[in-house]
């Protein structure tokens, strides 16, 4: 959420940022309501001053043994006016809050302006896509042929975009999770968190999923509870409504979780395989930093996610998202895209974003720069470190052999109990 004072003082700057995103949100209603609120606050303050004066006059009259009924009646009328005015102000503030919650973050000046993913800018590549001497299979065929993935029974038991991992498939998924957590905690300084997979509405509001993206969430019927779409939600909200000490920052957390997404807008996209599931596993990286350090932290976070792909030997590229492709809450985002032979293209496997104080303001997460200073909002960042199912897909496709077997990446062999090859 943007600072109300910033929007009030810089409407042209906010509108320019919205225009870069391709948003047609108008600030007219916001500015009108904000002006109305400030006018009513002045009137309310005047009425409260009047009430104080009348109250003092009543006290003097009673002390002197004189009739104070007229003044008492006057104070009741003033008190009612104050109540009515406070109610009006509260209603206006609710409308202002609703508008502020609907406004996306303002893109950082370093973000390329564009309409969509076609305007993203490639920053760098790592590794070279493998040249196969045979026709490579897609991961869904490989998984079913090896009896380690079962999409048909996933559909039977639950529905479309659900799957079973079996045998070596389940073991490889678990190996990836443990490897990622070990690398981030041992080499990158993250503290592991194992969060709840169900959160309340306030948590979803804090990280920006609500109210705008309610249709993409799985909500528990009749309850103010949601299945998490990413561990970003519970881990960021870990410090909701708290004031951190300056020496605590930066805070690095990593978390494994299952993720649940309705994917309401993804009909017809990536219908086969593990690329777009309603339930999938992910290791998430979350940071809380001082404002002046957040962009340096974004570069480090992105490098941390890249390290996973490098260790797995998977070719990938880093792209800087354009204003038209960025998420609602982000001020700047890098996507890591892994090479998938079945698509003959790079596919997203991680998004690393700096939200500035956008989430912290919604979730009320602050820090105190000095022991006696006024609390300020922290900056929050997160990124996938990385999406586990997509990593498994990339391993199956990039490490497949002509006989249909899969070579296990060397770094995962210890996590697989010494198994170096997955065969039928």
UniProtKB/Swiss-Prot annotation:
Pathway: Aminoacyl-tRNA biosynthesis; selenocysteinyl-tRNA(Sec) biosynthesis; L-seryl-tRNA(Sec) from L-serine and tRNA(Sec): step 1/1. The keyword Glycosyltransferase does not apply. Signal peptide: none annotated. It is an enzyme of class 6 (ligase). It is found in: Cytoplasm. GO terms for molecular function: ATP binding; catalytic activity, acting on a protein; serine-tRNA ligase activity; transferase activity. Belongs to the class-II aminoacyl-tRNA synthetase family. Type-1 seryl-tRNA synthetase subfamily. This is Serine--tRNA ligase. It comes from Desulforamulus reducens (strain ATCC BAA-1160 / DSM 100696 / MI-1) (Desulfotomaculum reducens). The lineage of its organism: Bacteria, Bacillati, Bacillota, Clostridia, Eubacteriales. The gene is serS.
């Amino acid at each position: 959420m943007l600072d109300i004072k910033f929007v009030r003082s810089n409407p042209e700057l906010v509108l320019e940022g919205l225009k870069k995103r391709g948003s047609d949100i108008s600030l007219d209603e916001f500015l009108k309501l904000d002006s109305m609120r400030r006018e009513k606050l002045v009137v309310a303050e005047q009425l409260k001053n009047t009430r104080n004066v009348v109250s003092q006059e009543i006290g003097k009259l009673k002390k002197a043994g004189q009739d104070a009924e007229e003044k008492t009646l006057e104070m009741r009328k003033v008190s009612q006016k104050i109540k009515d005015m406070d109610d009006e102000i509260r209603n206006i503030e609710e409308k202002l809050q609703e508008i502020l919650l609907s406004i996306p973050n303002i893109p950082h000046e370093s973000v390329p302006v564009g309409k969509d993913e076609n305007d993203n800018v490639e920053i760098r590549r790592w590794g070279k896509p493998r040249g196969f001497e045979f026709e490579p299979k897609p991961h869904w065929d490989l998984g079913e042929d090896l009896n380690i993935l079962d999409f048909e029974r996933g559909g039977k038991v639950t529905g479309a975009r659900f799957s079973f991992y079996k045998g070596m498939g389940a073991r490889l998924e678990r190996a990836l999770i443990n490897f990622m957590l070990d690398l981030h905690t041992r080499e990158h300084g993250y503290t592991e968190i194992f969060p709840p997979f169900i959160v309340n509405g306030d948590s979803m509001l804090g990280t920006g999923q609500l109210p705008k993206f309610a249709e993409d969430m799985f909500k528990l019927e009749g309850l103010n509870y949601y299945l998490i779409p990413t561990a970003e939600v519970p881990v960021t909200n870990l410090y909701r409504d708290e004031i951190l000490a300056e020496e605590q920052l930066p805070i690095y957390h990593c978390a494994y979780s299952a993720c649940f997404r309705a994917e309401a807008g993804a009909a017809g996209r990536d219908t086969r395989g593990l690329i777009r599931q309603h339930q999938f596993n992910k290791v998430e990286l979350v940071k809380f930093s001082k404002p002046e350090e957040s962009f340096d932290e974004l570069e480090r976070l992105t490098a941390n996610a890249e390290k996973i792909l490098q260790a797995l030997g998977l070719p990938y590229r880093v792209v800087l998202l354009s204003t038209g492709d960025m998420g609602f809450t982000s001020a700047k985002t890098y996507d890591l895209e892994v090479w998938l032979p079945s698509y003959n293209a790079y596919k997203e496997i991680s998004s690393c974003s700096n939200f500035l104080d956008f989430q912290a303001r919604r979730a009320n997460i602050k820090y105190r720069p000095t022991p006696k200073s006024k609390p300020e909002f922290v900056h929050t960042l997160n990124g996938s470190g990385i999406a586990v199912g997509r990593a498994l897909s990339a391993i199956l496709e990039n490490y497949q052999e002509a006989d249909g077997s899969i070579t296990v990446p060397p770094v995962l062999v210890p996590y697989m109990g010494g198994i170096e090859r997955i065969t039928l």
